[in-house]
Amino acid sequence: MKWVSVFPTNVFKGIQNVTGIMVISEIETGFPLAVIDGTLCTKIRTAAVGCVAAQYLAPTNVETLGIIGSGEEARMHFTLLKHLFPSIKECRVSSRKQESEELFIAKFKDLTPDVKFVACGNDSHKCAVDSDIIVTAISSQAPVLRAEDITKGSLYIHVGGWEDEYGVALKANKIVCDDWEASKHRTQTICRMYKEGILRDQDIYANLYD
């Protein structure tokens, strides 16, 4: 069993917004065998889903990665995407917190010396424009990513909350979800669009499991 809580306002308290635990039970009796940290598992799983999408939907030659956010989920996405695409030569990082952005770059610049890291501060346009893959790994409740920030042919991996304006989804050639039925009643951008009648079920091209 996996138990996860998401509190977006935790960011203002200087603590992570996603926490979780996992309980492993014996399959024949149901007795609990272990209680383990579910937070790391959740981060790995989330980034892995993004990588599955990237494997099939990313441009042919991925060289530039733009990541909006610099927390644990952003770091996990960089780690797995760089493993999936060794061709990545540049990683742009945009963060509301300069210290967090600097820590992100410091963590990876020695581990991946073949990658040029670009600190973009609050400039999400600089981070996203002309990037082959864009990842938003923040818990924003107001858009920071605009339609004009997205270059034709790029892949946008939406991880967080309501960090992109409606125009981003309307500009997309295809919208692919991990599981549309499970997620369409949440508060992410395309879910808001669905509730407002702007997006319909038939506008979703596919689920990742299709």
Feature roles, as predicted:
Residues 83-111:
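NAD(P)-binding Rossmann-fold cofactor-contacting core
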Residues 57-64, 87-88, 151-152:
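Short helix-loop-beta connector
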Residues 126, 133, 139-157, 167:
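Rossmann-fold NAD(P) dinucleotide-binding segment
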Residues 69-71:
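Glycine-rich Rossmann-fold phosphate-binding loop(s) that bind the pyrophosphate
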Residues 169-210:
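Adenosine-phosphate binding glycine-rich loop
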Residues 138-140, 160-161, 180:
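Short glycine-/small-residue-rich Rossmann-like dinucleotide-binding loops
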Residues 74-75:
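N-terminal Rossmann-fold NAD(P) dinucleotide-binding loop
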Residues 1-43, 51, 58-61, 206:
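N-terminal ligand-binding/catalytic initiation module
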